[in-house]
């Protein structure tokens, strides 16, 4: 009998709370009055959220700050010594976001969070350096069970031949 107490209290709270009451921090909408939203921007990390208003204000503030010539010179020196280049690639991702939806049955309205999927189609760029590519190659070799390149050149570790060439040839007449 004591189990009915919380259910009855929740049911009464749903009738007592007016339909225009919205929990703090939740914007609601109905399906018939949805307007086209502005395209959203995303970061590399799907756990982070960009607020377009703050992004624009940050960009406006950063545009006022000009880097010093010493900073520009050190950046160009780093790029030339490390042999780095800017690589562009497509970074299409599928994001799952929760959007609030307000639903009303007669005069009883409630807000629920529905999961929606957003496809992000962007061209991303990253700074690639020759030394990082060499380290990636070395890690791939280690994960494949191959020796490091310097040990392979010194004949420290020999791999078995991949295939016997004589076995591949068909025996002719």
UniProtKB/Swiss-Prot annotation:
Its main location: secreted. The keyword Secreted applies. It comes from the Eukaryota. The keyword Metal-binding does not apply. One of its GO terms (biological process) is supramolecular fiber organization. Forms intermolecular disulfide bonds either with other MAGP-2 molecules or with other components of the microfibrils. N- and O-glycosylated. O-glycosylated with core 1 or possibly core 8 glycans. O-glycan heterogeneity at Thr-54: HexHexNAc (major) and HexHexNAc + sulfate (minor). PANTHER family: MICROFIBRILLAR-ASSOCIATED PROTEIN 2, MICROFIBRILLAR-ASSOCIATED PROTEIN 5. It is linked to Aortic aneurysm, familial thoracic 9: A disease characterized by permanent dilation of the thoracic aorta usually due to degenerative changes in the aortic wall. It is primarily associated with a characteristic histologic appearance known as 'medial necrosis' or 'Erdheim cystic medial necrosis' in which there is degeneration and fragmentation of elastic fibers, loss of smooth muscle cells, and an accumulation of basophilic ground substance. May play a role in hematopoiesis. In the cardiovascular system, could regulate growth factors or participate in cell signaling in maintaining large vessel integrity. Component of the elastin-associated microfibrils. This is Microfibrillar-associated protein 5. The lineage of its organism: Eukaryota, Metazoa, Chordata, Craniata, Vertebrata.
